[in-house]
From Swiss-Prot:
Belongs to the ATPase B chain family. This is ATP synthase subunit b, chloroplastic. F-type ATPases have 2 components, F(1) - the catalytic core - and F(0) - the membrane proton channel. F(1) has five subunits: alpha(3), beta(3), gamma(1), delta(1), epsilon(1). F(0) has four main subunits: a(1), b(1), b'(1) and c(10-14). The alpha and beta chains form an alternating ring which encloses part of the gamma chain. F(1) is attached to F(0) by a central stalk formed by the gamma and epsilon chains, while a peripheral stalk is formed by the delta, b and b' chains. Keywords: ATP synthesis, ATP-binding, CF(0), Chloroplast, Hydrogen ion transport, Ion transport, Membrane, Nucleotide-binding, Plastid, Thylakoid, Transmembrane, Transmembrane helix, Transport. InterPro entries: ATP_synth_b/b'su_bac/chlpt. It is a single-pass membrane protein. In plastids the F-type ATPase is also known as CF(1)CF(0). F(1)F(0) ATP synthase produces ATP from ADP in the presence of a proton or sodium gradient. F-type ATPases consist of two structural domains, F(1) containing the extramembraneous catalytic core and F(0) containing the membrane proton channel, linked together by a central stalk and a peripheral stalk. During catalysis, ATP synthesis in the catalytic domain of F(1) is coupled via a rotary mechanism of the central stalk subunits to proton translocation. Component of the F(0) channel, it forms part of the peripheral stalk, linking F(1) to F(0). GO terms for molecular function: ATP binding; proton-transporting ATP synthase activity, rotational mechanism. It is found in: Plastid, Chloroplast thylakoid membrane. Its main location: plastid. It comes from the Eukaryota. The gene is atpF.
Length: 183
């Protein structure tokens, strides 16, 4: 590359001896000078241009390769992230289902416990009602019995005279006496 640059510098400072030389005045140049300059540029510039284009091509290819590697790495990371997301979603669904089933289980247990408590309360209420009914019936029986006894005593006291009273006592004494003799 240095040789090419030195050649251009050498041609640019070539002494003009009259017949052949490089004319730097573009308006004063002729077709032959232009052809020579273009030919030299093509001959020497072809290698330089090829080197520049090859370097540029290599950089572009290198950039493309790096981009492809980055893209592949990004795709792999994306796939890993998707897999993790699916796993987390499955775990979340599992926790949600376990939570719902736990809630349903607790609900069923609470309903069962409440049902049992209600049954016990109903049984206790029925027993209390039965005992209260029995007590009320016993009180009514007792009052009826007391009234009957008082009525009978009243009737007996009004109907009994002294003679009937003595006769009843003698009959009872004779019954008791007969019982004593048998034993």
């Amino acid at each position: 590359m240095k040789n090419v640059t030195h050649s251009f510098v050498f041609l640019a400072h070539w002494p003009s001896a009259g017949s052949f030389g490089l004319n730097t005045d573009i308006l004063a140049t002729n077709l032959i000078n232009l052809t020579v300059v273009v030919g030299v540029l093509i001959y020497f510039g072809k290698g330089v241009l090829k080197d520049l284009l090859d370097n540029r091509k290599q950089r572009i290819l290198s950039t493309i390769r790096n981009s492809e590697e980055l893209r592949r790495g990004t795709i792999e990371q994306l796939e890993k992230a998707r897999i993790r997301l699916q796993k987390v979603e499955l775990e979340a669904d599992e926790y949600r289902m376990n939570g719902y089933s736990e809630i349903e289980r607790e609900k069923a247990n609470l309903i069962n416990a409440t049902s049992i408590s209600l049954e016990q309360l109903e049984k206790s209420k029925n027993e209390t009602l039965y005992f209260e009914k029995q007590r009320a019936m016993n009180q009514v029986r007792q009052r009826v019995f007391q009234q009957a006894v008082q009525g009978a005593l009243g009737t007996l006291n009004s109907c009994l005279n002294t003679e009937l009273h003595f006769r009843t006592i003698r009959a009872n004494i004779s019954i008791l006496g007969a019982m004593e003799w048998k034993s």
